[in-house]
From Swiss-Prot:
Belongs to the complex I subunit 4L family. It is an enzyme of class 7 (translocase). This is NADH-ubiquinone oxidoreductase chain 4L. The gene is MT-ND4L. Gene3D superfamilies: 1.10.287.3510. It catalyses: a ubiquinone + NADH + 5 H(+)(in) = a ubiquinol + NAD(+) + 4 H(+)(out). It comes from Equus asinus. It is found in: Mitochondrion inner membrane. Its main location: mitochondrion. GO terms for biological process: ATP synthesis coupled electron transport.
Amino acid sequence: MSLAHINIFLAFTVSLVGLLMYRSHLMSSLLCLEGMMLSLFVMATMVVLNTHFTLASMMPIILLVFAACERALGLSLLVMVSNTYGVDHVQNLNLLQC
């Protein structure tokens, strides 16, 4: 395993630990999820480039599409919660139920 793979795995692990530690605020959770998706994208791109597996070359792009959708939904939820309650605590998400 090369140093680049170790760095990307470490970035994913740090983002996961950050998600587990700072899960009370929605903005912190979204930033940690974004770090996880970015490290997964870089890892998928490195795997495709190292293995020369041409059929899997679309996988990083599909991952970016899903990350963009996740980002848009997360930011819209953040705006809705902060406009409604004034804070971005995750515990306020339970109050949004009908």
